Amino acid sequence: MKAALLTLAVLFLTGSQARHFWQQDEPQSPWDRVKDLATVYVDAVKDSGRDYVAQFEASALGKQLNLKLLDNWDSLSSTVTKLREQIGPVTQEFWDNLEKETEVLRQEMSKDLEEVKQKVQPYLDDFQKKWQEEVELYRQKVAPLGSELREGARQKLQELQEKLSPLAEELRDRARTHVDALRAQLAPYSDDLRERLAARLEALKEGGGASLAEYHARASEQLSALGEKARPALEDLRQGLLPVLESFKVSLLAAIDEATKKLNAQ
């Protein structure tokens, strides 16, 4: 989880120009990437939810209750889609403003990250080379044992496992040694990057350009504006949900009443 969060943080701070792996489009903005991820997630939830509703309505209990959940679900999905279309331009404007306000900080951090990357790359290459050598050495040691197993009888399996165990432990110990060495080599650069980030933030705090207080004030203003502009769309969503909820309530009460009558008649 920490690695995923760090990757996302670096991605947004550096304004990475990654492309879709299935397309050769122009580089996406951070907002476009966030919007695409959110759209895929919402659509997946909506589709899976509709499948569950359809399965319930097709069941014996669903047919007996006849709640018409699928119709209500489609109405709700349509309302949510409309809300997303209305809020889209508003959130786009908010993200554009935020991206503009942090442009200088992102550029400076991008330079710092690239410089640190160039410094640590030799250590990473050396680690990869040593790891490949260790794996190849392990493969060479294990190969004869595999031949013994193919040529020998089933009872030699236990003997083979006993021979493989120390080799696997040796590979693990040697790998741990290389990892510890790499961690020690990279530690100064990690500290350097952390100090640089702290220095950038301190410079902002002391007034080198826009101060952190100004950033906070601007972000608060933009969030307030976002709330004001999104309020009509949210009200439309509420109004759109009312008939859906009312229809569901009527269907549910009718189903309960029908079930009560059947129980009383027995």
From Swiss-Prot:
SUPFAM superfamilies: Apolipoprotein A-I
Intrachain S-S bonds: none
Record's function text: Participates in the reverse transport of cholesterol from tissues to the liver for excretion by promoting cholesterol efflux from tissues and by acting as a cofactor for the lecithin cholesterol acyltransferase (LCAT). As part of the SPAP complex, activates spermatozoa motility.
Pfam families for the chain: Apolipoprotein (PF01442)
Compartments (UniProt record): Secreted
Family (UniProt): Belongs to the apolipoprotein A1/A4/E family.
Residue stretches of each Sequence repeat: 67-88, 89-110, 111-121, 122-143, 144-165, 166-187, 188-209, 210-231, 232-242, 243-266
Secretion signal, residue range per the UniProt entry: 1-18
Region called 10 X approximate tandem repeats, residue ranges: 67-266
Gene Ontology CC terms: chylomicron; extracellular vesicle; high-density lipoprotein particle; low-density lipoprotein particle; very-low-density lipoprotein particle
Annotated protein name in UniProt: Apolipoprotein A-I
Main location: secreted
Highest taxon above the source species: Eukaryota
Residues with the Methionine sulfoxide modification: M109
One GO molecular-function entry: phospholipid binding
Organism: Canis lupus familiaris
Gene giving rise to this polypeptide: APOA1
